[in-house]
Amino acid sequence: MATYSTNEFKGGLKVMLDGDPCSILENEFVKPGKGQAFSRVKLRNLITGRVWERTFKSGESLEGADVLELDMEYLYSDGDMWHFMRTDGSFEQYAVDKKAMGDVEKWLKEQVVYTVTLWNDNAIAVSAPNFIELEVVETDPGLKGDTAQGGSKPATLSSGAVVRVPLFINEGEVLKVDTRTGEYVSRA
């Protein structure tokens, strides 16, 4: 496997650290007035999700992590596992557990493509597309003249997620939602 020197560190790079695959979130090169230069790196463990900071002396290197990020279509859930299928024509299916799903579970919609991270042929993380279109299944009716400023109300979506929406949104409407922030963007 390839090794990466500290001068090759950048956000999004996948490396092995203490036997676990990690993703570099931030890398700051520091050259103090006295002493050796070093890199202050913020990493996320891809298995546990833990984020921490480490410093590496200039010239140190880390082994690259053998992880695959594949686009997979969400098929169904059988209670404790979520099933995804590769979209590259192989139709290979992967079962993903609750830990790997994280908070993506509330943005799941059948036949939508998600990014699944595999390590040693096991799914360790799932990430949703930036925007997803979901139907409103429950919300209070918005009354005209209800407020002086533009107000908002909670709405439950078909996936179970609850987002704040403008008063003019009604049940049955399809909304575009930002999965990174959990905020309403527009009507679909």
Curated annotation (Swiss-Prot):
Keyword Cytoplasm: yes
Domain of life: Bacteria
Major localization class: cytoplasm
Pathway: Protein biosynthesis; polypeptide chain elongation
InterPro entries the UniProt entry points to: Elong-fact-P_C (IPR015365), NA-bd_OB-fold (IPR012340), Rib_uL2_dom2 (IPR014722), Transl_elong_fac_P/YeiP (IPR020599), Transl_elong_KOW-like (IPR013185), Transl_elong_P/YeiP_cen (IPR001059), Transl_elong_P/YeiP_CS (IPR013852), Transl_elongation_fac_P (IPR011768)
MF (Gene Ontology): translation elongation factor activity
Subcellular location: Cytoplasm
Pfam name, any one: EFP
Any one Gene Ontology cellular component term annotated for this protein: cytoplasm
Listed SMART domains: EFP (SM01185), Elong-fact-P_C (SM00841)
Modification N6-(3,6-diaminohexanoyl)-5-hydroxylysine, positions: 34
UniProt PTM comment: May be beta-lysylated on the epsilon-amino group of Lys-34 by the combined action of EpmA and EpmB, and then hydroxylated on the C5 position of the same residue by EpmC (if this protein is present). Lysylation is critical for the stimulatory effect of EF-P on peptide-bond formation. The lysylation moiety may extend toward the peptidyltransferase center and stabilize the terminal 3-CCA end of the tRNA. Hydroxylation of the C5 position on Lys-34 may allow additional potential stabilizing hydrogen-bond interactions with the P-tRNA.
GO biological process: peptide biosynthetic process
Record bears the keyword Membrane: no
Keywords: Cytoplasm, Elongation factor, Hydroxylation, Protein biosynthesis
Assigned protein family: Belongs to the elongation factor P family.
Function text: Involved in peptide bond synthesis. Alleviates ribosome stalling that occurs when 3 or more consecutive Pro residues or the sequence PPG is present in a protein, possibly by augmenting the peptidyl transferase activity of the ribosome. Modification of Lys-34 is required for alleviation.
PANTHER family, A to Z: ELONGATION FACTOR P, ELONGATION FACTOR P (EF-P) FAMILY PROTEIN
NCBIfam families referenced in this protein's UniProt entry, alphabetically: efp, PRK00529.1
Record protein name field: Elongation factor P
Source organism (scientific name): Chromohalobacter salexigens (strain ATCC BAA-138 / DSM 3043 / CIP 106854 / NCIMB 13768 / 1H11)
